[in-house]
Amino acid sequence: MGARFRQSADGYFLRTDSQLATRGAPRDALVADLAPPEVRGAAFGLLQSLDTVGSFLGPLLAMRLMLLWANDFRTVFWGAVIPAVLAVALLFFGVREPERHQDGKRINPIRRENLRRLSSAYWWVVGIGATFTLARFSEAFLVLRVQATGLPLAFVPLVLIVMNVVYAAAAYPFGKMADSRSHKSLLAWGLLLLILADVALAWDGHWGVVWVGIVLWGLHMAMTQGLLAAMIADTAPADLRGTAYGFFNLASGLALLIASGLAGLLWDSLGAAFTFIAGAIISSVALALLLLRRSA
């Protein structure tokens, strides 16, 4: 039963990541184009908050409809078409992109001369974002960690609900804070939260400490994800933002793949506690590099 849950959890995150791969870059580029620079952090924080609310309200609604319609998958999936159609209608009729003045025909933006226009500050954000992801493997391991404490299988989904509620509640306030505070300082605090979360999740004592780790994990996500998106917008040329977000998502996706693969190997060979300790070590190295860059 636990194995089946692990497979379903892994499948959930694979599907989620594939959705982000197709919509993440154009969505973030559109927000960066429409949001005034002085409130860009708040805009991305609100985006992360609403996106997270949808990610856990959708499955809860699907569960309710499955019970209401006697496990009729076909009807439930047809019901899911409704919000998708509403989203497309809102995109086409309610969102106006800023005007772009282009001379001649469109060309492929992924060209050597365009990549040279992406500054070292941009590539630093890409690197630090990939390092964050390398230290923060798939949330499926949070589910497995709580399950190992003896929580009944029926209540295991509470892990993602709690983490996402914290994430959604804190993303906008942290995003708004990013508009008036040092981005590097907030990144450092976000890494510190991740280190504390890893230490709590590695704890073999009371199960309550593990739940503290879940909350800290959600706070880390809220503090860093919208902030990194805003930093990409600040460091990339306006006409290359889609490309910039695409490379950022590519680097983060590869880092997540590597991190989750290594975490799985560590989990199977050395146990859950060592897996999260390894995450804390990687986070500590990233924090040290960030602080060294701040002092340079």
Regions inferred by a protein language model and the residue ranges of each:
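Structural signature of the two symmetry-related core transmembrane helices
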Residues: V81, S185-A200, A280
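Transmembrane alpha-helix termini and helix-breaking/packing motifs in multi-pass membrane transporters
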Residues: L57-F77, I258-F274
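C-terminal ends and interior cores of transmembrane alpha-helices
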Residues: M1-F5, L192-G205
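Helix-to-loop junctions at the C-terminal end of transmembrane segments
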Residues: M66, A170-S182, W267
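Symmetry-related core transmembrane helices of the 12-TM Major Facilitator Superfamily/SLC fold
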Residues: T75-F92, F274-L291
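Cytoplasmic helix-loop-helix junction between adjacent transmembrane helices
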Residues: Y12-L50
